[in-house]
């Protein structure tokens, strides 16, 4: 049973975050919301392994929680009280004693392609940059004649790399660009390092929980978890739960080519999910609308549908490919 926050001794809530511009934006957003509710906060930034190890694709590093582990350790050691994450980066299993304390209202869940000149390359041969296996697989499934190159780093770094190379475009999470104020008038991308255009990829099924921010706290920390609970958005909480349950059932971790999107539709929930081979040549999809009361096992049930439709073999192939 959750204690009344006024019955627990107040404290300055130490907010842990990665030190990238986007992560700091997220942490300051949480701090402001907590401040508005009367809580005192302090932001503590750390550098994650994922921000340091930039010379290899994420899937080759083989590190679970590469963007979250440093903050997990800081929280367990009492250096921070809560941690703010992009939810799509969070492993489906949390460390012992840690809990998901709140999910903030979801922003734009879509992917967007940022490009330099024009879109003529879409009908010819092209080179697209992304560090995501899901984006790579979905792009190659739609554009099999294209080449995909690896792209790592924070948002500004990736935009700079796009400017410096002869790639035709690069794929980003739209929410990140919007949060940093880099999208103007719908499709103009403008940052300190890049000016170009963007095209929303409405056909691309996003990463589970893309566009959502999550806050973790220790289960024993009554004050912090109760304070943060006031920020929870129930609709986003339910939708991301379904998507991550789908991911966990497929055993995809954060790097396999898996997409999932749940959304409320009146008194129903719509769900789209996909599992692809790394080269995009194979894919298994589900697309369902179900009564809202079925949400608790929806992700599991639809993942089982994919597994029973060739997904077991495809997941085995993917895992073997990633081991090479």
Predicted feature descriptions by range:
Residues 2-54, 60, 136, 143-324:
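Small-molecule-sensing regulatory modules
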Residues 64, 81-86, 168-173:
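Paired acidic/hydrophobic, glycine-rich loop segments that form the ligand-binding mouth/hinge
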Residues 87-90, 175-177:
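Short glycine-rich anion-binding loops that position phosphate/pyrophosphate groups of nucleotides
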